[in-house]
């Protein structure tokens, strides 16, 4: 906030409305519940849905995500972005890929094309300090992270390095 005020001295800061956020979060999660009972809230404005058992009734993951987005827009007047994938990490990254109102499918066939060219700092669970360490080692993209030997990443980052290797290669089974 101080950086924003420094760049824009006339900035008008509006106080947050936590009660409204919670209210809409609950309503959106109720909409999710119409499509699956496997809803895992991640934050006030994000949830993971497992729609595996819902596909026979509602259609594939992309169709379900698009239907949820349409329902939220029509009933609540809000937009949302959705990521559809074979694990939580890639689903989250898919939801970030096209904002503010889109569905992105990251599959086993396309994840290298979509995610690997991205800066390593865009990898879920790579914070600023980790990105700096990776960059210093010449690892600039998610693809380079994926192609780095696991042992080297473990040596650099400990257990987290091994996890990032799995995440970048789509080996996470969440």
List where the protein language model places each region.
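Gly/Gly-Pro- and Ser/Thr-rich, intrinsically disordered tail segments characteristic of DNA damage-repair
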Residues: 1-169
């Amino acid at each position: 906030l101080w950086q924003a005020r420094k760049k824009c001295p006339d900035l008008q800061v509006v106080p947050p409305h936590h009660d409204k956020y919670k209210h809409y979060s609950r309503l959106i999660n109720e909409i999710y519940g119409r499509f699956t009972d496997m809803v895992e809230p991640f934050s006030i404005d994000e949830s993971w849905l497992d729609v595996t058992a819902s596909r026979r009734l509602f259609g594939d993951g992309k169709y379900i995500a698009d239907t949820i987005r349409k329902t939220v827009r029509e009933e609540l007047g809000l937009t949302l972005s959705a990521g559809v994938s074979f694990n939580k990490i890639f689903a989250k990254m898919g939801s970030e890929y096209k904002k503010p109102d889109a569905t992105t499918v990251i599959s086993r066939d396309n994840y290298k094309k979509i995610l690997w060219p991205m800066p390593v700092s865009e990898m879920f669970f790579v914070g600023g300090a980790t990105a700096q360490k990776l960059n210093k080692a010449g690892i600039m993209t998610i693809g380079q992270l994926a192609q780095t030997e696991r042992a080297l990443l473990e040596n650099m980052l400990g257990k987290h390095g091994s996890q990032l290797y799995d995440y970048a290669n789509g080996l996470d089974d969440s």
